UniProtKB/Swiss-Prot annotation:
Gene Ontology CC terms, in alphabetical order: cytoplasmic side of plasma membrane
Keyword Oxidoreductase appears in the UniProt entry: yes
NCBIfam families, per database record: D1pyr5carbox2, PRK03137.1
CDD domains per record: ALDH_PutA-P5CDH-RocA
Coiled-coil intervals, chain numbering: none
InterPro entries from the UniProt entry: Ald_DH/histidinol_DH (IPR016161), Ald_DH_C (IPR016163), Ald_DH_CS_CYS (IPR016160), Ald_DH_CS_GLU (IPR029510), Ald_DH_N (IPR016162), Aldehyde_DH_dom (IPR015590), Proline_metab_enzyme (IPR050485), RocA (IPR005932)
Gene Ontology MF, one: 1-pyrroline-5-carboxylate dehydrogenase activity
Name of the gene: rocA
Top-rank taxon, per record: Bacteria
Source organism: Bacillus cereus (strain ATCC 14579 / DSM 31 / CCUG 7414 / JCM 2152 / NBRC 15305 / NCIMB 9373 / NCTC 2599 / NRRL B-3711)
Keyword NAD annotated: yes
UniProt protein name: 1-pyrroline-5-carboxylate dehydrogenase
Pathway the protein acts in: Amino-acid degradation; L-proline degradation into L-glutamate; L-glutamate from L-proline: step 2/2
């Protein structure tokens, strides 16, 4: 009997024992910084001369690790191993697969602060953001294990006295998992374990800037008893290894989280039926957003300002759910804007390894350059009232930036920035605010701050996003509580952490027996 699911609690760092435990986690990670990590194919650890070099984005001189890089030849070897392993893994008991997830979750829980410390070093996450990432990884494993137990016997369908009918789920085959750098543990672990607990085998290609946490997760899966060949670790270039695996005729599905442009490229390539391919590939994609917090004139204005600042600048705005636009009723615009500026100027941007740091660096030089280019655009399209500066001398640090008085059709209101920049736009009324919020090709998250019940219900129906929140920020979905995924160019609305997510990794089979 499995206990009911509830999410992993976040760590309270005001408790001295928790603070000391996290500091021990940092010391442990610092003791093995700079290590080399191999590919893992069929349980075999393979070291290559070509490496992916992972550095600390808060200190470019600090080497986090060097991870062997797969070639096309090694990717092909991994595919053959995964394809062969699938023939036995697909017949494994769902209960056994779920138990592996539960054991893996328990291992991570014991090493929680160590994994969070890796995220501090490799992803530049402050303590609270790193802790939440690790908690979410645990949540995915606990939740998907339980979901598989619910689905293992299929779903009841009608039978008649003369026949017995069953509706069952069977796994798809080999899945290619292409995970992101912004939640390099939680999303990577969630995508991987959803695929394997459903009976599929996996080729895991983690993000090139954060491969070490994925390599450490492979150790967890092995310790949890996952058979060799079920998950194969193949970091590599997207243009070489990624494209090759997406195109491969034995690939049955691709699960991707990342940018719009790469997601579209994967969707296009996966749609092509290549020689030897006997199925249509399935694509599960989450591709980003241009997320809006709408503030009504009948609202808690302090809550509004705090929600905007927290959602815009948590993890330096590098969440696909981050608030990139604040659309505010003209009657309360100045009040909310001024308060948000005050709160933003209180934020500390520093080394995320130091407790109390609000914001660390952005991911890498490319991210720094892109965000700073949008800061320059902001100077032309509005008024910068906070931030606007960046410093990439030691790490990739950008000050939290508020751009006021931005027109609703400006670039800052349309294009995904993926950094600590939020545009403020004035709305004439609530209908106008919703129209501005919906005026984007994305549809991932949004929030409405209002005390007007009619406006809440109107937004529930007309605000076209996959995750909509009322009287809170637009980030922080919790597995099993707020299934996550968006509309339009935000992806396939796959709803990670939801009750129908595992079904995307399986296919339904009907059997009918005449009695």
């Amino acid at each position: 009997m499995v206990v009911a699911y509830k999410h992993e609690p976040f760590t309270d760092f005001s408790v001295e024992a928790n603070k000391l435990a996290f500091e021990e986690g940092l010391k442990k990670v610092e003791s093995y910084l700079g290590q080399d990590y191999p590919l893992i194919i069929g349980g075999e650890k393979i070291t290559t001369e070509d490496k992916i070099v992972s550095v600390n984005p808060a200190n470019k001189e600090e080497l986090v690790g060097r991870v062997s890089k797969a070639s096309r030849e090694l990717a092909e070897k991994a595919m053959q191993v995964a394809d062969e392993t699938f023939q036995t893994w697909r017949k494994s008991k769902p209960e056994m697969r779920a138990d592996i997830l539960f054991r893996a979750a328990a291992i991570v829980r014991r090493r929680k602060h160590e994994f969070s410390a890796i995220l501090v070093k490799e992803a530049g996450k402050p303590w609270n953001e790193a802790d939440a990432d690790t908690a979410e990884a645990i949540d995915f494993m606990e939740y998907y294990g339980r979901q598989m137990l619910k689905l293992k016997d299929g779903i009841p369908v009608e039978s008649r006295p003369i026949e017995y009918n069953r509706f069952s789920y069977i796994p798809l085959g080999v899945g290619v998992i292409i995970s992101p750098w912004n939640f390099p543990f939680a999303i990577m672990a969630g995508m991987t374990t959803a695929a394997l607990v459903s009976g599929n085998t996996v080729l895991l290609k983690p993000a090139s800037t954060t491969p070490v946490v994925a390599a450490k997760f492979m150790e967890v899966l092995e310790e949890a008893g996952l058979p060799a060949g079920v998950v194969n670790f193949v970091p590599g270039n997207g243009s070489e290894v990624g494209d090759y695996l997406v195109d491969h005729p034995r690939t049955r599905f691709v699960s991707f989280t990342g940018s719009r442009d790469v997601g579209i490229r994967i969707y296009e390539r996966a749609a092509k039926v290549n020689p030897g391919q006997i199925w249509l590939k399935r694509v599960i994609a989450e591709m980003g957003g241009k997320d809006t917090i709408v503030v009504d004139k009948e609202a808690d204005l302090e809550l509004a300002a705090k929600s905007i600042v927290a959602s815009a600048f948590g993890f330096s705005g590098q969440k696909c759910s981050a608030c990139s636009r604040a659309v505010i009723h003209e009657d309360v615009y100045d009040h909310v804007l001024n308060r948000a500026v005050e709160l933003t100027k209180e934020l500390t941007v520093a080394n995320p390894a130091v407790l109390g740091t609000n914001m660390g660096p952005v991911n890498d030089q490319a991210a720094f350059d892109k965000v700073m280019s949008y800061v320059a655009i902001g100077k032309e399209e509005g008024r910068i009232l906070a931030g606007g500066e960046g410093d990439d001398s030691k790490g990739w640090f950008i000050q939290p930036t508020i751009v006021a008085d931005v027109a609703e059709d400006a670039r800052l209101m349309k294009e995904e920035i993926f950094g600590p920049v939020v545009a403020f736009c004035k709305a004439k009324d609530f209908d106008h605010a919703l129209a501005i919020a919906n005026n984007t090709e994305y549809g991932l998250t949004g929030a409405v701050i209002t005390n007007n019940r009619d406006h809440i219900e109107k937004a529930r129906e007309d605000f076209h996003v996959g995750n909509l929140y009322f009287n809170r920020g637009c980030t922080g979905a919790i597995v099993g509580y707020q299934p996550f995924g968006g509309f339009n160019m935000s992806g396939t609305d796959s709803k990670a952490g939801g009750p129908d997510y595992l079904a995307l990794h399986m296919q339904a089979k009907t059997t009918s027996e005449t009695l």
